[in-house]
């Protein structure tokens, strides 16, 4: 069988300053056969995206130093002239990037952008033929009313439709290789499932090779033949996807697999108290003519975790902000048996919620200073205690947010929420931006803190597997309303509402056979999005 991709002893170095460099990829070798599918899996900083970019020569002009050898469809990428690389890119090999908004020109219609790519590689094609090809591929990737939507601009598409449009652009010239770099990371679970199903179907129809770059092992389970696990720029393990996911040989691969949240996870037994800490009755929140939350009622008991799940636009984040008083409801009643400062929040993005010009110690101290109950010496001591409580070195008090990793910054956010000794913390997507092992660590930390301090948690997320790990009861939201609620085991094991069933059917699983079966089962449940 002919190798479509051959990478031999690849090294990639980036200059960090005038005298030093960072090695992003170190001695990597692999092949991808024509028509095959390989998953390149690793956490942030593993070198997987740098490798994918190098396959198309996208390192040129970045200051990166490349060593080794890369051949893609017979082209020596490292020695090829620019003209030869242009013929390769988009023609015989194409790439789908993580963020479609940054890849699509906001000024031009989506169909015109696809037609332009087609004409670059087919200069004799007429404008009309190129536009017809754009409509054809948009229709193929599942864009409804493709001829009309080809005239739409990117902002008029949903996130899932923009990703479909990028895939259509990549398919315009019938490439032999498609490189997909984290193509579903920013998408809701049902849209993610649709995109992965689309890639699977396109492979089957066209025979193209697929290199799928991702940090999510669940994503590769039903999408590729082989998996290459990367860590620190090196290949840790490679093998058939079923073998690597079921019986990983290397400790790092095993740690990745064990950290993946599962729908069948056994939750630690908890015995929440009967007294109600917070009660919401018929909460409604409108923004102009848009209703974000529409008549939601709930209770949170002392010591329990209430999971709130839903996709983008479901109203779950707005609900969470109302519960802690950051947003006032338009109507409805919100009652709590503790003072307002006992209701705290951990935000999704710690980068935007921490002041980059202030040390993390000072940020954690803010709610303590606002209370005016402790002197400066006591405040510093309390902050150091909190840093230690969340697993950070107390001596890091004077460090700034940019000096920490994403998981460490989220620990800082948790420490700040703990500062006023809260009774309830609303966690808004606290692990959605984290690698799977860091995600598991943060979830474990929250559970440990809850057990030790007797806290109540409202855990807001779109990841149903994570929510099951932590929740006693679950609310499922769609379009601002609660469509299903109940004990977590009942909602997950016997969902009643079609939307809940569709969400659960779309959750990635680690078993390739089960993944294939779920793909078949969900086709009748999931609309195009």
Q: Where are the model-predicted features located?
A:
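Conserved ABC transporter NBD signature motif
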Residues: 64-76, 331-341
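Conserved ABC ATPase signature
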Residues: 152-157, 161, 400-404, 408
């Amino acid at each position: 069988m002919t190798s479509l991709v051959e990478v031999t002893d690849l090294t990639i170095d980036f200059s960090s300053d005038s005298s030093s460099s960072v090695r992003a990829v170190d001695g990597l070798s692999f092949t991808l056969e024509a028509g095959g599918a390989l998953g390149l899996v690793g956490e942030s900083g593993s070198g997987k995206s740098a490798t994918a970019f190098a396959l198309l020569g996208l390192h040129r002009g970045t200051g990166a130093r490349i060593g080794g050898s890369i051949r893609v469809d017979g082209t020596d990428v490292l020695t090829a002239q620019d003209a030869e690389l242009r013929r390769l890119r988009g023609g015989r090999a194409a790439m789908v990037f993580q963020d479609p908004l940054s890849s699509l020109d906001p000024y031009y219609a989506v169909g015109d952008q696809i037609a332009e790519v087609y004409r670059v590689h087919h200069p004799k094609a007429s404008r009309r033929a190129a536009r017809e090809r754009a409509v054809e591929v948009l229709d193929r990737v599942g864009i409804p009313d493709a001829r009309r939507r080809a005239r739409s601009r990117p902002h008029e598409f949903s996130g899932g439709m923009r990703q479909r449009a990028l895939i259509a652009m990549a398919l315009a010239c019938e490439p032999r290789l498609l490189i997909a770099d984290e193509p579903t990371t920013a998408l809701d679970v049902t849209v993610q499932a649709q995109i992965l199903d689309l890639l699977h179907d396109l492979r089957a129809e066209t025979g193209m090779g697929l290199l799928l770059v991702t940090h999510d092992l669940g994503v590769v389970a039903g999408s590729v033949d082989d998996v290459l696990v990367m860590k620190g720029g090196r290949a840790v393990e490679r093998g058939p996807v079923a073998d690597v996911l079921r019986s990983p040989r290397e400790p790092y691969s095993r740690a990745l697999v064990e950290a993946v949240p599962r729908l069948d996870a056994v939750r630690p037994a908890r015995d929440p108290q009967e007294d109600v800490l917070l009660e919401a009755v018929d909460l409604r929140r409108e923004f102009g003519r848009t209703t974000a939350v529409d008549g939601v009622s709930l209770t949170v008991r002392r010591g329990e975790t209430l999971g709130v799940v839903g996709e983008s636009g479901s109203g779950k984040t707005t609900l969470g902000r109302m519960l802690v008083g950051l947003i006032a409801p338009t109507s409805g009643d919100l009652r709590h048996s503790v003072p307002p400062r006992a209701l705290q929040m951990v935000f999704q993005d710690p980068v935007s919620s921490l002041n980059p010009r202030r040390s993390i110690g000072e940020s954690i101290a803010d709610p303590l200073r606002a209370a005016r109950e402790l002197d400066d010496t006591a405040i510093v001591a309390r902050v150091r205690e909190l840093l230690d409580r969340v697993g950070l070195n107390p001596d890091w008090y004077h460090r700034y947010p940019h000096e920490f990793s994403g998981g460490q910054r989220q620990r800082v956010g948790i420490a700040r929420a703990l500062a006023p000794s809260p009774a309830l913390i609303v966690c808004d997507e606290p692990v959605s931006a984290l690698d799977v092992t860091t995600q598991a660590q943060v979830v474990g930390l929250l559970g440990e803190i809850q057990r030790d301090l007797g806290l109540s948690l409202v855990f807001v997320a779109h990841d149903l597997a994570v929510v099951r790990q932590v929740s006693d009861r679950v609310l499922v939201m769609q379009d601002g309303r609660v469509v299903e609620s109940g004990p977590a085991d009942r909602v997950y094991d016997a969902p009643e509402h079609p939307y809940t069933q569709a969400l659960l059917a779309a959750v990635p699983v680690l078993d390739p056979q089960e993944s294939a079966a779920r793909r078949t089962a969900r086709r009748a449940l999931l609309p195009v999005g």
